[in-house]
């Protein structure tokens, strides 16, 4: 279980195009207080990215609190399994459990924008091996196309506020 958690901790930053699929996902992550911006884990600790709600064996599970409702649940599940598998396969030991609030903790390994997340996603050999390079390139191409379309739109806020500053 602990190697699985460490796999989540290590590989989540590389899987952000799955966990945070669009510009609003990144807004939610970095603009709200209730979303973990870290790769910490804790028992019953909602401020951690990876929460173990109960340590009773029959109820034990790990919640990944980074993905939102705008994700593809099948891809998120596959990404979680892949991360955990790599943690077990590589026998990676997890960090210590976080018992205090981690809401203020921002992990520097978490990409801050779509471009950074796509670069990390495309360049991790282990992730490419598990998900297949063609799949990785396809996801990255779609995310880039969506982001470019977003950047080409002038918002009503820009028209209303910035036009007055000219």
Question: Predicted segment positions?
Answer:
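Acidic, glycine-enriched catalytic cores built around paired aspartates
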Residues: 102-166
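Active-site capping/gating regions of soluble enzymes
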Residues: 1-98, 102-107
């Amino acid at each position: 279980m602990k190697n699985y958690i460490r796999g989540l901790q290590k590989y989540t930053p590389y899987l952000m195009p799955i966990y945070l699929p669009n510009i609003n996902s990144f807004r939610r992550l970095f603009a709200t207080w209730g979303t973990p911006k870290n790769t910490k884990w804790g028992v019953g600790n909602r401020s951690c990215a990876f929460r173990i709600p109960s340590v009773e064996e029959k109820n034990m599970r790990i919640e990944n609190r980074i993905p939102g409702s705008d994700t593809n649940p099948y891809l998120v599940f596959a990404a979680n399994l892949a991360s955990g598998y790599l943690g077990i396969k590589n026998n990676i030991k997890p960090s210590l459990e976080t018992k205090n609030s981690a809401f203020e903790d921002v992990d520097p390994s978490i990409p801050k924008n779509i471009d950074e997340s796509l670069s990390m996603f495309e360049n991790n050999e282990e992730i490419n091996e598990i998900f297949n390079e063609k799949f990785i390139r396809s996801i990255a191409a779609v995310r880039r196309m969506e982001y470019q379309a977003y950047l080409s739109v002038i918002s009503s806020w820009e028209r209303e506020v910035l036009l007055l500053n000219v």
